[in-house]
Structure formats: structure tokens, C-alpha cells
């Protein structure tokens, strides 16, 4: 039976009958200059198939050479995840055929990973701490990228042709695999989101990856299974592949819990398979049967020697670890005088790093918080994207805040300037100039608009002179309308008060 034959079980009913068990596999592309086993550039965005060589194309006789920086950064990630670092680890060949892997095998690590037995402590939305145990973090190379043409949803099923770009083939990856996450119950989707978010913050703080989920430099595979309440044995799992946002991680886990519960309730069986996440409605769709380790026929790569990590080198790397995110947050919270709830809101919104960068660019903490948590979070929600995927930088937000502080933009005009930047109309100053947004500084023009507004509203003038000074809002509104919102409200209020004195 297929998933499409089933409705979703109500979430509360799922939890009454089943316990969810999760396993999360996160792939992080390392921001090295070159690929993991050869010399081409590892930078994102080049012309298709321009960053390739005999190794990444799998040509006969091509021999891989390990990128030392990739190994160093893998150790750095392992240390930050409280992992044990193997003094000796090995690369293995993971054998399978797919067009995005020209060699017909992927260089990975199997039974001898570079880092193992760690944990990452995360904080849930209400401040509850949760420890996620890490099984392993291992090095491998990324695959190429396929673009399927002619299909209804951009996938291979129904496609009439596929384009292969091998630029990504061979880029260094660290795959971080959790141990089974049990006992989360109704909070399982939230735990998944919190963990992936915390991991993203961590690798960005380490400086080893930009962790752009929207660009594929960080991707999550979510394994989900259910077992009847009160039982111990794990159920059959599915693996939803290549999830590319925090919100999608949460939705995919929740959907699979509800889908699997309904399948089991109706007497069906869960098929061990990969699944695809559908951004349009938060559902998952059937992929391919899930292979076992035996299917990949792992064996040690004969072209690569063991990776030796002496304890002295590991300690040297440990000494280079930067201020880690949870320590940094505690410091920032103290410096900014934020309550625990306020700090959680910033973190949960994905706004903290953006706010810090905006402050570093010259804005005050309150100005930066106001823009990112209020206006820009709303814009991100409207667009259905993560906050850091918006087409505006912290430096641009700081520039808008500076123009407001200088009196060159009102708050309303500033929002229009931000809208222009988000729409791709240029940098802040270019948008302000092109849209003619700068506050009017012509005293004569503003005074004329005030005089006309007063003349058109004699009843308001009478009320003001009778002692009701709060009625000037209509006059200010008329002046702002006449100047297309470009007059300085403080200047307008001052002129009104002077003329009615």
C-alpha cells in the first residue's frame, strides 16, 4: 500500500498510541578553498562543470590526495561536539551507481570515523534543555548535482532528461550522525529543529562552513520510526532526505509521525525507504527502497592511507576553538540586559547572529533587534524563508538605522527602503535615491504644507486653541500626505506648535 492511500492521524492520537524515535544525519559542506581529494576550487556558484578534474570526474588512473585543512576542520567539529577523536581513522569506498557520482563510488568513512561518542546540548522553545547524543562525525566527499527536466516536481520520476554538474563532486563533507533520539514524545519535531539549528550555529561559529541550508551547504536527513507505547523494539524507519530549512525539518518529522501512525492503524506496514520532503505542503513522498550497509559493499580505499591524528595535534586544534555559541549567548544576554525569554525569542527566530553583525556594523542593539525581530521576521514569514535567507545584509540594515538616526529617513520611509533592498533594487543608498525617499529638508516647502493643512482644518485649530493639544495628529497626517511621507514629523510638530501658539 502507498502513503497516498492514507490520511494523517491526529497528532494527539499519535502520541496516545506510539512513541517516536528519531535519528538525524546532517551533512555539512566545509568551506575549504579546494576539494577534499583534489585541487579544483570548492567555491559555490561557478559555471557548471568548470571546477572539475580527473579525480572528481572519476577518470582512470586519477589518484586522490587528502585535503589537510578538511581533516583539521573535521577534528575541530568533533571537539566542539564533545566527541572522542580517533588517533587513526580510515577512508572507505561506498559503492553505488548514480549519475551524480562518476566514480561509481563515494569516498567516505565507515567503521573507523574520525570522531565518535559525543553530544550537543540544545535548548527548546520554552528553555528546556535537551542533550542529543552523537554517534559519529565522519569525513566524506559530496556528490555532483542533478537537474531533472520535464518532470512535474523537478525529480527524476517523469523527467525527460537530466543535467549533471560535477562542480560539487568531491567537495569536503562532514556527516554528523546522532544516536537514536528517544523519549521526546510530542516534542520530537521541536527537538529535531532545535538540534539542527544549534548545529548550524556551531559550525558557523567555528568558521568551517557558511551552513547555508538554502544553498545546500548544510542538509539534514531525518530518520523517523514509531513503536507502540510501552514497547522497546524500534519500528521500521523511513529517511526523509536533503531537508533544507529548520522549519522543514520540524514539519517533515511531524508529518512522518502522523503518516506512519495512520498506516499502522489501518493494518499496513511501514516500508524502509527514502522519502522526499515537499516544500509546498509540508508532506513527504515516496522515494526509493532504503539500502543497508551491506548493499554498499564498503571496503577500505586502497588509494588512501589511514588518517593519523596525534594527541598533540588534536590539542593544538582544541586551543584554536572560538567562543562557542552557548557561551557567546550568555555573554551577549548579560551585555544587552535581556531576560531569558527575550534571549530565547532572538535565538528561536534565528536572529541573534544577524543582530550581532548589525550592531558590529554600527547600529544599536535596540535598533538591530527592532528591525530583525519585528519587520524582517514578518517579511521572512510572508516569503516562507528563513530569516538569514532574506536578500538583505546586517550591514544594509545598519545603514538604514543610521539614516533614520541622522534624520534622513522616517521610520515609514526606512521600511520602504528596506522593501526596495529586499526586492533587489540595489543597495540602501541606491534605493533611497531611486525612490526619492529622503526626508524633505526644505523648510519653506514644509511650512507651506503646514499652512495649507491648518487652513483646511479650522475646527481642529479651534479645538487646539481651546486646550485640546492632542488633535494635531490630523494636521500632521495632512502634511505627511502632502509631502509623500518625506517630512520630518518632529519638524512638522514644531512648526504646528509655533503657528498655533
Swiss-Prot record:
Chain segments carrying region Disordered: 271-299
Basic and acidic residues bias locations: 288-299
Pfam families the record matches: GatB_N, GatB_Yqey
Enzyme class label: ligase
InterPro entries: Asn/Gln-tRNA_amidoTrfase_suB/E, Asn/Gln-tRNA_Trfase_suB/E_cat, Asn/Gln_amidotransferase, Asn/Gln_tRNA_amidoTrase-B-like, GatB, GatB_Yqey_C_2, Gln-tRNA_amidoTrfase_suB_CS, Gln_synth/guanido_kin_cat_dom
GO biological process, one term: glutaminyl-tRNAGln biosynthesis via transamidation
Keywords: ATP-binding, Ligase, Nucleotide-binding, Protein biosynthesis
Catalytic function, reaction form: L-glutamyl-tRNA(Gln) + L-glutamine + ATP + H2O = L-glutaminyl-tRNA(Gln) + L-glutamate + ADP + phosphate + H(+); L-aspartyl-tRNA(Asn) + L-glutamine + ATP + H2O = L-asparaginyl-tRNA(Asn) + L-glutamate + ADP + phosphate + 2 H(+)
EC number(s) on file: 6.3.5.-
Alphabetized SMART domains for the sequence: GatB_Yqey
GO molecular function term, any single one: glutaminyl-tRNA synthase (glutamine-hydrolyzing) activity
Subunit structure of this chain's protein: Heterotrimer of A, B and C subunits.
Protein family: Belongs to the GatB/GatE family. GatB subfamily.
Functional note: Allows the formation of correctly charged Asn-tRNA(Asn) or Gln-tRNA(Gln) through the transamidation of misacylated Asp-tRNA(Asn) or Glu-tRNA(Gln) in organisms which lack either or both of asparaginyl-tRNA or glutaminyl-tRNA synthetases. The reaction takes place in the presence of glutamine and ATP through an activated phospho-Asp-tRNA(Asn) or phospho-Glu-tRNA(Gln).
Name of protein: Aspartyl/glutamyl-tRNA(Asn/Gln) amidotransferase subunit B
Annotated organism of origin: Corynebacterium diphtheriae (strain ATCC 700971 / NCTC 13129 / Biotype gravis)
Amino acid at each position: 500500500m502507498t502513503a497516498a492511500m492514507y490520511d494523517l492521524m491526529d497528532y494527539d492520537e499519535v502520541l496516545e498510541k506510539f512513541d517516536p524515535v528519531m535519528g538525524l544525519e546532517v551533512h555539512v559542506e566545509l568551506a575549504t578553498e579546494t576539494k577534499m581529494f583534489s585541487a579544483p576550487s570548492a567555491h559555490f556558484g561557478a559555471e557548471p562543470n568548470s571546477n572539475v578534474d580527473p579525480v572528481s570526474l572519476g577518470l582512470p588512473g586519477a589518484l586522490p590526495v587528502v585535503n589537510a585543512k578538511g581533516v583539521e576542520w573535521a577534528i575541530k567539529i568533533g571537539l566542539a561536539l564533545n566527541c572522542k577523536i580517533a588517533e587513526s581513522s580510515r577512508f572507505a569506498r561506498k559503492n553505488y551507481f548514480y549519475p551524480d557520482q562518476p566514480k561509481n563510488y563515494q569516498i567516505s568513512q565507515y567503521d573507523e570515523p574520525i570522531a565518535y561518542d559525543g553530544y550537543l546540548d540544545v535548548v527548546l522553545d520554552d528553555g528546556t534543555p535537551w542533550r542529543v547524543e552523537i554517534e559519529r562525525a565522519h569525513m566524506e566527499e559530496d556528490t555532483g548535482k542533478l537537474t531533472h527536466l520535464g518532470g512535474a516536481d523537478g525529480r527524476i520520476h517523469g523527467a525527460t532528461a537530466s543535467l549533471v554538474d560535477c562542480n560539487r563532486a568531491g567537495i569536503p563533507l562532514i556527516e554528523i550522525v546522532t544516536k537514536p533520539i528517544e523519549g521526546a514524545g510530542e516534542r520530537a519535531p521541536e527537538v529535531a529543529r532545535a538540534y539542527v539549528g544549534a548545529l548550524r550555529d556551531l559550525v558557523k561559529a567555528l568558521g568551517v562552513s557558511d551552513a547555508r541550508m538554502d544553498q545546500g551547504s548544510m542538509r539534514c536527513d531525518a530518520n523517523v520510526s514509531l513503536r507502540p507505547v510501552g514497547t522497546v523494539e524500534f519500528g521500521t524507519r523511513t529517511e526523509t532526505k536533503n531537508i533544507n530549512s529548520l522549519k522543514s525539518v520540524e514539519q517533515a518529522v511531524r508529518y512522518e509521525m502522523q503518516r506512519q501512525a495512520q498506516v499502522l492503524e489501518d493494518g499496513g506496514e511501514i516500508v524502509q525507504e527514502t522519502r522526499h520532503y515537499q516544500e509546498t505542503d509540508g508532506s513527504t513522498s515516496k522515494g526509493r527502497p532504503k539500502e543497508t550497509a551491506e548493499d554498499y559493499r564498503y571496503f577500505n580505499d586502497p588509494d588512501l592511507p589511514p588518517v593519523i591524528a596525534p594527541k598533540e595535534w588534536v590539542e593544538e586544534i582544541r586551543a584554536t576553538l572560538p567562543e562557542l555559541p552557548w557561551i557567546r549567548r550568555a555573554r551577549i544576554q548579560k551585555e544587552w540586559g535581556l531576560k531569558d525569554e527575550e534571549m530565547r525569542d532572538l535565538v528561536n527566530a534565528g536572529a541573534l547572529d544577524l543582530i550581532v553583525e548589525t550592531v558590529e556594523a554600527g547600529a544599536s542593539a535596540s535598533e538591530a533587534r527592532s528591525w530583525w525581530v519585528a519587520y524582517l521576521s514578518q517579511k521572512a514569514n510572508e516569503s516562507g524563508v528563513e530569516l538569514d535567507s532574506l536578500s538583505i545584509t546586517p550591514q544594509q540594515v545598519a545603514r538604514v538605522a543610521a539614516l533614520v538616526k541622522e534624520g534622513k529617513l522616517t521610520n515609514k520611509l526606512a521600511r520602504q527602503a528596506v522593501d526596495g533592498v529586499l526586492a533587489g533594487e540595489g543597495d540602501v543608498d541606491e534605493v533611497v535615491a531611486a525612490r526619492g525617499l529622503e526626508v524633505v529638508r526644505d523648510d519653506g516647502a514644509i511650512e507651506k504644507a503646514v499652512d495649507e493643512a491648518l487652513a483646511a482644518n479650522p475646527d481642529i485649530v479651534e479645538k487646539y486653541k481651546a486646550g485640546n493639544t492632542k488633535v494635531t495628529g490630523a494636521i500632521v497626517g495632512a502634511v505627511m500626505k502632502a509631502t509623500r511621507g518625506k517630512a520630518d514629523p518632529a519638524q512638522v510638530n514644531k512648526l504646528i506648535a509655533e503657528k498655533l501658539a
